[in-house]
Amino acid sequence: MSKPDVSKLNRGNIVEFIGGIFDRRGDEEYLGEPVTMAEHMLQGATIAEQNGQPEEIIVGALLHDIGHFTSEFGMFSMDDTEDRYHEEAGAEVLEQFFPSVITDCVRYHVAAKRYLCATKPEYFNRLSEASIHSLKLQGGPMDAEEVAEFEKNPNLKQIIAVRYLDEAGKRADMETPDYWHFAPMVQRMVDKHMGA
């Protein structure tokens, strides 16, 4: 199965394109966690669905780490001289197709970890060893100025919800449906943003 031309992505094929990423690349290791990339994202979405969360939270959890696959979107080059932050890369790709609440959940899920560690010290105890390591690389807990700025985001509640799902989606033995179970919901979010 070959990758489609990203310049031809539109509301009619973006959902299938993302599904292809899950199918082709989902078995990749998830940063030292006991789950694959697909399992991680599917677990977050499944937990959200089981808890009756709104579709925007479910889809935000499902797609929050899609930026790890920047090569699928033509955004990676061997000439790159700096990190392409996966959260920003993912949001950049999705923002033309999805409402801002979803792209904010993607763009700020790393910042939300830093925020929660600064404002709810007990949150740190939820973090896995790999997540603690990445927290250090991401700048550690936010300072007071960063917290105040972050709290201005109108989608703060949803971003925080996805962050909790991000941390919860690391269970080695959890059964989940596949991406295609969520695909109709993903399409509804695309249609909501782009006009049905």
UniProtKB/Swiss-Prot annotation:
InterPro entries: HD/PDEase_dom, HD_domain, OP_Dioxygenase. Binds 2 iron ions per subunit. During catalysis, TmpB uses a mixed-valent Fe(2+)/Fe(3+) cofactor. [(1R)-1-hydroxy-2-(trimethylamino)ethyl]phosphonate binds at Y30, H68, H86, H109, K113, S131, S134, R163. Residues 37-156 form the HD domain. It comes from the Bacteria. Its cofactor is Fe cation. Keywords: Iron, Metal-binding, Oxidoreductase. It catalyses: [(1R)-1-hydroxy-2-(trimethylamino)ethyl]phosphonate + O2 = glycine betaine + phosphate + 2 H(+). Fe cation 2 binds at D65, H86, H109. GO terms for molecular function: metal ion binding; oxidoreductase activity. Fe cation 1 binds at Y30, H40, H64, D65, D166. Its EC number is 1.13.11.90. Involved in the degradation of the naturally occurring organophosphonate 2-(trimethylammonio)ethylphosphonate (TMAEP). Catalyzes the O(2)-dependent cleavage of (R)-1-hydroxy-2-(trimethylammonio)ethylphosphonate (OH-TMAEP) to yield glycine betaine and phosphate. Is highly specific for its N-trimethylated substrate. This is [1-hydroxy-2-(trimethylamino)ethyl]phosphonate dioxygenase (glycine-betaine-forming). It comes from Leisingera caerulea. The lineage of its organism: Bacteria, Pseudomonadati, Pseudomonadota, Alphaproteobacteria, Rhodobacterales.
